[in-house]
């Protein structure tokens, strides 16, 4: 069957909660209000809605001995849906994927055409799908979103994660993670929580688990590591192969602290280009490394066989809250220098890691030409070939 029908009651509740949250400038004010306990229960019910779908026409079966082709992509909400669908369906390096994990996936947002992005993509590709919400969006979008928005308001107003699979998904669960909800509410007008989506894939020879997680971007390396450790603790009991993907926001900087802007300015402005590139493209190594990789290694996960350390995102200072917080004259003065920094600041944020797979002959690649302004997404997709152990 195609994606489940849109639920009018869910849409009404989303609009009611958006209206209820709108008067509050801070999360503390919202939480202090007498209505918050009931609003929190309603929000929890809304965000517990996990959508699953079976395709109208399943993708052709593949030889079970063939390597597993895995694609991960942060699709920037699905704003440029047609370009994303075309790439996943026809691009030489992306088509015929066995598993596709997606971050930043809308349900009923004006910026992405008011679509069920995951459900429509999965049905077009002949794949099974699971989608889970992270946040209720209170606006029609930010930054470049309004360039692609349809003229009407949002419907469900939800934003989340998805797993698409050639084989049925026999179980899906959400793993709650610690997160900077205050920052997201006050800066981006999003209300919700961070979760990881964990799915059991019914491969005909060797069933395996696929998890995807979008880690936070506004805080420190330690905070991202704490999020990852919670997920890894949940996955520790899995005895079969585990695939773990996501936009882990491994930019190597500690944001949200008093001196974070100055601490970042030194490397971005003064380091030689080669040294800066090594830091930003190899965030799993060196003194500024993201601590989440230490946690992954301790939990038995590998990522080096499945990636190439190429950039997956170009830094865009126009989207950073720290830049918007500058006084106008200072921001104008800094703009020329920031443009220079953007050109040399390419980030490796997206990853495929695995435990319990045979890494012999594994490969990973970042797919060029699909990311950047006006293209399918702001992130590049990544693809890996893995070998399942015999059943």
Which residues are covered by each model-predicted region?
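Structured beta-strand-rich core segments of catalytic domains in phosphoester-bond hydrolases
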Residues: 3-62, 105-207
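Active-site-proximal beta-strand elements of phosphoester/diester hydrolases
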Residues: 65-77, 173-175, 207-217
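Active-site environment of divalent metal-dependent phosphoester hydrolases
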Residues: 78-80, 107-110, 137-140, 182, ...
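Active-site beta-strand/loop signature of hydrolases that rely on acidic residues for catalysis
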Residues: 69-74, 88-114, 132-134, 164, ...
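Metal-dependent phosphoester-hydrolase catalytic domains
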Residues: 1-55, 174, 221, 235-243, ...
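Alpha-helical structural signal in soluble globular domains
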Residues: 91, 119-128, 234, 291, ...
